[in-house]
Amino acid sequence: MKIFCYGTLQESNVQLDLVGRVVDGPITYVSGYVVLRDYVDPEDGIAYPRVVPAENGCVYGRVLDFTDAEVKVLDAYETEMYVLEDIQVASGETVKIYMPS
């Protein structure tokens, strides 16, 4: 499954920890969104990124291809805070993205 990653899932150390391999993919962007880091988890104190609509916004990231088994691991990592939705990247391709739930 191709997923547009705009946060920690782009980091090789996170990928290695989660799926046991480094996943690389093309840099691209989605228009009409911005990344906010305005939610701080009260348990760990970390500010997590989230993508929200913004008329003139643009979010850069990478399209990474994960297996179905890897996506299950990513879903657990992202918790109920995020859900997979369809989004169109700059090339016109429709891929998945973790959006705030």
What are these regions (language model features)?
Residues 1-101:
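Glycine-aromatic micro-motifs
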